[in-house]
From Swiss-Prot:
The chain crosses the membrane at residues 17-37, 65-85, 93-113. The keyword Iron does not apply. The gene is TMEM244. It is a multi-pass membrane protein. InterPro entries: Integral_membrane_SYS1-rel. This is Putative transmembrane protein 244.
């Protein structure tokens, strides 16, 4: 009994990856919107998913919104990626996260070196 590995064509992998990225940022902005409503934040930056410079304090409402929306996004995307990719969910989730870090670095014009941002990202990966 030989081990058979099925490799998807590059086009299919790219389509699934693109769908996962669109799904990720859609869920992210929906969870940010819901967080703003729940925490009664009346103004939040459009680039909030890429903001790692917010002061990490439990007294800072914007930080709470960003933290909760990040955790909710990764949890929900973990569930939504399953029907999209069917298998190799971790590969797609990690690839989307790497792209998110790259986009964050590009948008903020510096690499995120804050420990609280990486801790939130690491905990989020466990939720997938």
């Amino acid at each position: 009994m030989a081990l058979q590995v099925r490799v998807a064509p590059s086009k299919v992998v790219l389509q699934k990856f693109l769908l996962c990225v669109i799904l990720f940022y859609t869920v992210y902005y929906v969870s940010l919107s819901m967080g703003c409503v729940m925490f009664e934040v009346h103004e939040l930056n459009v680039l909030a998913p890429f903001d790692f410079k917010t002061n990490p304090s439990w007294l800072n409402i914007n930080y709470k919104v960003l933290l909760v929306s990040t955790e909710v996004t990764y949890f929900v995307c973990g569930l939504f990626f399953v029907p999209v990719v069917e298998e190799w969910v971790w590969d797609y989730a990690i690839s989307v996260t790497i792209l998110h870090v790259a986009i964050t670095s590009t948008v903020m014009l510096e690499f995120p070196l804050t420990s609280h941002w990486w801790a939130a990202l690491g905990i989020s990966k466990l939720l997938v």
